């Protein structure tokens, strides 16, 4: 709270970013222990520093709840809002990409299913945060990577978020 209070004294708003690297986690932690890169689907790609494992539906739900818990703590710490990071190949972008997300369950396949992770995160934030909390989204319009999110996928996700008024602003990377 010290930092947010100091910033507020100068009339400035404070936001925190919420992100999960998914497949883009580093291969080892600071102790040299091999890390697990959880992703929508198993992935072998030069952007991945560790072998990926497919997320189970239970882990997906746990991660979504983790976004909300973290956002609640940030608001309690004096942040004015949070920004969901769905850019630069992080986990929400991995779910959006039909080349990365090759699931056949409710989390993959159709465009609507691939959007489910991002929409469920935003819906839960709206449910659990006070109305005064600002919720934003950072998304890459075109990741310029053969496995990355393409403009049509990003624009469709933005339209779905807008249709439900789930975010207050969009930060296009």
Give residue spans per PLM region:
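Flavin-dependent oxidoreductase catalytic cores
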Residues: 1-173
